[in-house]
Amino acid sequence: MTMGDKKSPTRPKRQAKPAADEGFWDCSVCTFRNSAEAFKCSICDVRKGTSTRKPRINSQLVAQQVAQQYATPPPPKKEKKEKVEKPDKEKPEKDKDISPSVTKKNTNKKTKPKSDILKDPPSEANSIQSANATTKTSETNHTSRPRLKNVDRSTAQQLAVTVGNVTVIITDFKEKTRSSSTSSSTVTSSAGSEQQNQSSSGSESTDKGSSRSSTPKGDMSAVNDESF
């Protein structure tokens, strides 16, 4: 048989494996499998389809990865407790240095016994303080406000209004009648003016009479002197 008659043994052709991971692509630099929608690698930001002849690794990302790998674990919480306990131990030493007068002042402040504190709950104390504050403010308001003159105090009508836990009493007064007061004042003023006019006219008449009576006496005295 010649060379041409030889036949190559029949081999089954390689069939393409079913691509189970269609759409995913591996990065040529970091070999990370990215999704089909990604245009760049999600780790090293390398574009899809770049060659690996001269790979350009991002130095910042490498530094971050190294820092994460060799990052020191967070310190345990026991150290914090020790730090808190240290100043507590130092406090008694500082308290010893304080003069006894300061300690006496602190003891004098605690005059109220514990039994009284238990008897008076904080809610009642707050309510008493608020009531005292309201009474003080009401007293200051009453003292500062001037009283009205044209008001009859005899005619007073009170109206109580309650809003929640607060009750407000409103007092209404009527004005004084101005007609009688004005007429009496005008009469008294006119009578006073007439009296002033009469007194002024009487004083003028007395002055004239005194001047007339003084002149003839002077003349008579002069005539008597001449006769002598």
Curated annotation (Swiss-Prot):
Q: Which residues carry this modification: Phosphoserine?
A: S99, S123, S127, S130, S227
Bilayer-spanning residue ranges = none
- Span of zinc fingers (RanBP2-type): 21-50
- Modified how: Monoubiquitinated.
Q: Any idea what a deletion of this gene does?
A: Embryonically lethal. Embryos die at early postimplantation stage.
Q: Where is this region: Interaction with GABPB1 and FANK1?
A: 143-226
Q: Where is this cross-link: Glycyl lysine isopeptide (Lys-Gly) (interchain with G-Cter in SUMO2)?
A: K77
| UniProt record, GO biological process | apoptotic process; chromatin remodeling; negative regulation of proteasomal ubiquitin-dependent protein catabolic process; negative regulation of transcription by RNA polymerase II; positive regulation of apoptotic process; positive regulation of DNA-templated transcription
Classification via InterPro entries: RYBP/YAF2 (IPR039958), YAF2_RYBP (IPR033774), Znf_RanBP2 (IPR001876), Znf_RanBP2_sf (IPR036443)
Task: Give the location in the cell.
Answer: Nucleus; Cytoplasm; Nucleus, Nucleoplasm
Q: Keywords of this protein's UniProt record, alphabetized?
A: Apoptosis, Cytoplasm, DNA-binding, Isopeptide bond, Metal-binding, Nucleus, Phosphoprotein, Repressor, Transcription, Transcription regulation, Ubl conjugation, Zinc, Zinc-finger
Q: Does the keyword Repressor apply?
A: yes
Report the main location listed first in the record. nucleus
Summed up, the tissue specificity of this protein is: Expressed in embryonic stem cells.
Residue ranges annotated as compositionally biased, kind Basic and acidic residues, are 76-98, 113-122
Regions of biased composition (Low complexity) lie at 179-204
Q: Where is the composition biased (Polar residues)?
A: 124-143
Top-rank taxon of the source lineage equals Eukaryota
GO cellular component term of the entry, any: nucleoplasm
Molecular function terms from GO: DNA binding; transcription corepressor activity; zinc ion binding
Q: Where is this region: Disordered?
A: 1-21, 47-157, 172-228
Role, per record: Component of a Polycomb group (PcG) multiprotein PRC1-like complex, a complex class required to maintain the transcriptionally repressive state of many genes, including Hox genes, throughout development. PcG PRC1-like complex acts via chromatin remodeling and modification of histones; it mediates monoubiquitination of histone H2A 'Lys-119', rendering chromatin heritably changed in its expressibility. Component of a PRC1-like complex that mediates monoubiquitination of histone H2A 'Lys-119' on the X chromosome and is required for normal silencing of one copy of the X chromosome in XX females.
Q: What the record says about its domains?
A: Intrinsically unstructured in the absence of binding partners. Folds upon binding to DNA or RNF2.
User: By what name is this protein known?
Assistant: RING1 and YY1-binding protein
Q: Which organism is it from?
A: Mus musculus (Mouse)
